[in-house]
Curated annotation (Swiss-Prot):
Optimum pH is 5 with N-deacetylisoipecoside and N-deacetylipecoside as substrates. Its main location: cytoplasm. Beta-glucosidase involved in the biosynthesis of ipecac and benzylisoquinoline monoterpenoid-isoquinoline alkaloids natural products, starting by the condensation of dopamine and secologanin, and including emetine and cephaeline, drugs used both as anti-protozoal (e.g. treatment of ameobiasis) and as emetic agents. In response to pathogen and herbivore attack, triggers the release of toxic ipecoside aglycon to trigger defense responses. Catalyzes deglucosylation both on (1S)-diastereomer and (1R)-diastereomer substrates, including ipecoside, the main alkaloidal glucoside. It comes from Carapichea ipecacuanha. Coiled coil: none annotated. The lineage of its organism: Eukaryota, Viridiplantae, Streptophyta, Embryophyta, Tracheophyta. PANTHER family: GLYCOSYL HYDROLASE (PTHR10353), MYROSINASE 3-RELATED (PTHR10353:SF137). It is found in: Cytoplasm, Cytosol. Keywords: Alkaloid metabolism, Cytoplasm, Glycosidase, Hydrolase, Transferase. This is Ipecoside beta-D-glucosidase IpeGLU1.
């Protein structure tokens, strides 16, 4: 007779969830990234990134033809944004450091931009002065254009040394105050959509700068597409470039961790992780072993691709079997650097999909075949969506998916400490709405409530999740979607000097998770509440 007692199933509060249901040291916060919010593309000594070049060369490939030159002007309004974080009572704020703002030429040898250093020092100091913990991402997809021109960016092994130097500079300048680092955001997303060039203009060399990620947030435009080999390796196909980029991202991550542990760990005592994108891969037929295996394989290609090397120094077995020599092997020295190069796992979760081993007969037009992984994905079964769509594309709302993803990571990836580094939902930017109407975001409010309830349920089952960061703090420039999609808790008025206003979700989040509400469930809230968000019509900024 076993002496091991089963984990008790504790009740979850559903949409009444609040901070009191979590332990006192659980972290609540929100996130952003540099190119999506900062703007000031030509201010303060910043150099161009691949996104600057891409958006200016091919504005027709951004849904509204916009770019991040101004974004939401957080470079100049960062104190106001930090005030918002404080008013919401968040523990943490996640932001990324713009590589070309620190190193305009990409490398240390090309020169350090002291104005960029000063900006991030001011940002970090302002956060700490307001009792907000910084979570800092080193790479959120903004490769300096100089490095893209020199050697094709992450298609070249040369970038590993340049990224290590950039990371070391950040540790030297900011590590005395920053204790929570994320090396790379969503390496799978960056890798999987790299190497695609569009025939406008029709010369491959003119498109060099646009060979970069095509974000998953927006369907690709119906334009002629020409896929071509890298100039750095003429014999490499675009499909192979995907794995070459991923390989170099992993080596760059390991190099950054090595330099930190060798030079800074003893004095700065920081922690590290990568923010890995996930998706619940639900077997189309859970009674079909082939579909179950296909779903497992799909998760390998989504998450295991970048997590497994940190545990074993090798890619997932399914990837090695299917890709063979197309997937580079790590050297013994590289394996030593990779294994254990994390303190926690950052999990980005938005949505779910059905996975099948064969083409679903009822969804032939919608099902997508993933050639390398040998599986199909579809968002519906027998004509019924896996979850309601948030908008016209890609994000089906499936709260139970985050629970299953967390359980999968616990059971199959050595039970790591986990932070939810991104979780959120978009709404279409409807310019016909009044300001009052635009701030009513019931879909997001319910999305956050339902997903947080599932995160709590996973904790009850022993998953070591220790924090939750909403994506995103504010509406921002959403990559290929431009300004057409809004992910923020805070509404940005793009037509009135980027004025900030709280949406209903921000007011709820503040009332439920303010750091002063570290109380037992069902106890009254403190009476000294400053009331900043008491009314959903209160304006945060006045121009």
């Amino acid at each position: 007779m076993s002496s091991v007692l089963p984990t008790p199933v504790l009740p979850t509060p559903g949409r009444n969830i609040n901070r009191g249901h979590f332990p006192d040291d659980f972290i609540f916060g929100a996130g952003t990234s540099s190119y999506q919010i900062e703007g000031a593309a030509r201010e303060g000594g910043r150099g161009p990134s691949i996104w600057d070049t891409f958006t200016h060369t091919h504005p027709e490939l951004i849904q509204d033809g916009s770019n991040g030159d101004t974004a939401i002007n957080s470079y100049n309004l960062y104190k106001e944004d930090i005030k918002i974080v404080k008013l919401m009572g968040l523990d943490a704020y996640r932001f990324s450091i713009s590589w070309p703002r620190i190193l305009p030429g990409g490398s240390i040898n090309a020169g350090i931009n002291q104005e960029g250093i000063k900006y991030y020092n001011n940002l970090i100091d302002e956060l700490l002065a307001n009792d907000i913990v910084p979570y800092v991402t080193l790479f959120h997809w903004d490769v300096p254009q100089a490095l893209q021109d020199q050697y094709d960016g992450f298609l070249s092994d040369k970038i590993v040394d340049d990224f290590r130097d950039f990371a070391e500079l950040c540790f030297w300048e900011f590590g005395d105050r920053v204790k929570n680092w994320i090396t790379i955001n969503e390496p799978e997303s960056y890798s999987n959509f790299f190497g695609v060039a569009y025939d406008t203009p029709p010369k491959a060399h003119a498109l060099k700068a646009s060979r970069l990620l095509v974000p998953t947030t927006v369907a690709r435009p119906s334009k002629p597409v020409r896929v071509f080999a890298s100039t750095a390796d003429p014999g490499t196909t675009t499909a192979d470039q995907v794995y070459k980029v991923g390989h170099n991202l992993l080596l760059a991550h390991a190099a950054a961790i090595q330099v930190y542990r060798d030079k800074f760990q003893n004095t700065q005592e920081g922690t590290f992780g990568m923010a890995l994108v996930t998706q619940w891969m639900k077997p189309l037929n859970e009674n079909n072993p082939a579909d179950v295996e296909a779903a497992s394989r799909a998760f390998d290609f989504k998450f295991g691709w970048f997590m497994q090397p940190l545990i074993t120094g090798e890619y997932p077995k399914s990837m090695r079997q299917l890709l063979g020599p197309r997937l580079r092997e790590f050297t013994p020295d590289q394996k030593k650097l990779l294994i254990g190069s994390y303190d926690y796992v950052g999990v980005n979760y938005y949505t779910a999909t059905y996975v099948s081993s064969a083409q679903p007969p009822h969804d032939k037009k919608k099902a997508v075949f993933h050639t390398d992984g040998n599986f199909y994905t579809t968002d519906s079964k027998d004509g019924v969506l896996i979850g309601p769509l948030a908008g016209p594309a890609w994000l089906n709302i499936v709260p139970e998916g985050i629970y299953h993803v967390l359980q999968d990571i616990k059971e199959n990836y050595e039970d790591p400490v986990i932070y939810i580094t991104e979780n959120g939902v978009y709404e279409v930017n409807d310019t016909a709405k009044t300001l009052s109407e635009a701030r009513v975001d019931t879909t997001r409010l319910h999305y956050l409530q339902d997903h947080l309830s599932k995160v709590l349920e996973a904790r009850h089952q022993g998953v070591r999740v220790q924090g939750y960061l909403v994506w995103s703090l504010m509406d921002n420039w959403e990559l290929r979607a431009g300004y057409t999609s809004r992910f923020g808790l805070i509404h940005i008025d793009y037509y009135n000097n980027f004025a900030r206003y709280p949406k209903d979700s921000a007011i709820w989040f503040r009332n439920a998770f303010h750091k002063r509400l570290r109380i037992h469930v069902n106890k009254a809230r403190p009476q000294e509440d400053d009331g900043a968000f008491d009314t959903p019509r209160k304006r945060l900024r006045k121009y």
